[in-house]
Amino acid sequence: MTSPPKNPAPFPPFTRHSSERIYDSPWCGLRRDVVTLPSGELQEYHVLEIGPAVTVVPVLPDGRVLLIGQYRYPHGKTHWELPAGRLEPDEEEEAAARRELLEETGYAPDQLLPLPGFYPTNGISAHHASAFVATGCKQIAEPTPDSAEQITVGLFTREEVEALLDAGQIQDAFAALPLLYWLRGTHLQKKSSPAS
């Protein structure tokens, strides 16, 4: 395997002079910072604060992938996505991945294989998502989604997942990026986590 190219040389950081929390909710917060840019210019920078999250590519023993169809209020549409959600306080990423998969689909994995994590909105937030491939998934319960979640479960072959991605039908970054990593076999190069 080819080694990846190095990251670009780091730029000088911004200097933060003040930080004010201007909005809080159970789901997110908004912070207004006053910073000096490397050029010396003073500027306000608004930062969206969202806790860490997980997303899971569930793979059944026959190789099919489980996707969830979910309605999203902000744009009023239903799309195919992956089971995903925020970590509870003091919850480990793997435990959160198992919990979200079970809650949203009723499925549990034999094994979790880590994928590279990512920052879905790195221009406005330090929000980070950990990603996993869940292998050997079997249904062990009925889904128990949150009251605001409208979810349906669909099973897709690898070729159907590729077709959905190619057609632009998977538009959620929490689904598209981990699915692309899975299709490339990235999870096979990582250390596995056995079922608990």
Regions found by a protein language model. Name each.
Residues 2-13, 45-48, 55-99, 147:
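Conserved Nudix-box catalytic region and its N-terminal flanking loop in Nudix hydrolases
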Residues 14-55, 61:
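Acidic, metal-coordinating catalytic segment for phosphate/diphosphate chemistry
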Residues 16, 30-32, 44, 68, ...:
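Hydrophobic residues on conserved beta-strands that form the core of alpha/beta folds
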Residues 25, 74, 122-124:
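Short glycine/serine/proline-enriched coil/turn segments at secondary-structure junctions
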Residues 43, 52-55, 60, 86-173:
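Unchanged
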Residues 162-196:
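Long hydrophobic alpha-helical segments typical of transmembrane helices together
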